[in-house]
């Protein structure tokens, strides 16, 4: 039934920014297992917020949610889309600091985020799934083609780093 998890289903706990909402109460079957998604929203959360050294409201909310989930659960993390917006996050840093190297900035952002998740997960042993950054829905009238291509490159590099760092760190 819609909105109700039965005992036959395995729960996937979904944590993240607004893209996690598309998973809420979603049911699907994989290899004859039935899964049910429960989403927890952290409005405005970026990987940068979680991966930096500063305690902030995003970390506090993430940790509150993360520690309430039963140990050894399946957890889907959907964080990173805001880091990759055309007028926020990485693009804004590059615009304001032209000497910053794009590849290094993205790798540092992703690595710090993954390390943060690994550190939190040491005692919980959750099975972590990292969701990549989706293709944005951009109004082409508001941005020139070069800017859109630059954003596309940022997302491509970001997702490649997410995949590679997650794999390297055995996440």
Question: Where is each model-derived feature located?
Answer:
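A structural signal for short, well-ordered beta-strand segments and their strand-loop junctions
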Residues: 13-15, 74-78, 125-132, 170-171
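Residue-level preference for short coil/turn positions at secondary-structure junctions
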Residues: 7-8, 70-71, 124
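A generic structural signal for alpha->beta connector loops
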Residues: 9, 31-34, 125, 170
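A structural motif corresponding to the C-terminal end of an alpha-helix
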Residues: 112-130, 158-171
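Conserved SGNH/GDSL esterase-like catalytic core that processes O-acyl groups on lipids
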Residues: 12-112
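Long amphipathic alpha-helical scaffold segments
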Residues: 1-10
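Substrate-gating cap/lid alpha-helix
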Residues: 138-171
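Active-site-proximal loop/turn and secondary-structure-junction residues that shape catalytic pockets
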Residues: 81-83, 134-137
């Amino acid at each position: 039934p819609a909105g109700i998890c039965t005992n036959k289903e395995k729960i996937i706990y979904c944590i993240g920014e607004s893209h996690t909402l598309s998973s809420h109460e979603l049911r699907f079957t994989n290899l004859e297992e039935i899964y049910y998604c429960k989403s927890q929203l952290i409005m405005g959360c970026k990987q940068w917020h979680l991966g930096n050294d500063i305690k902030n409201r995003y970390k506090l909310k993430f940790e509150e949610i993360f520690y309430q989930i039963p140990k050894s659960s399946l957890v889907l993390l959907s964080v990173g889309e805001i880091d990759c917006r055309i007028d926020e996050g990485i693009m804004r840093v590059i615009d304001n600091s032209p000497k910053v190297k794009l590849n290094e900035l993205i790798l540092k952002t992703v690595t710090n985020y993954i390390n943060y998740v690994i550190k939190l997960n040491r005692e919980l042993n959750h099975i972590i799934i990292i969701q990549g950054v989706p293709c944005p829905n951009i109004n082409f009238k508001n941005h020139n083609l070069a800017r859109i291509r630059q954003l596309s490159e940022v997302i491509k590099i970001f997702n490649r780093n997410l995949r590679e760092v997650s794999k390297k760190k055995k996440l």
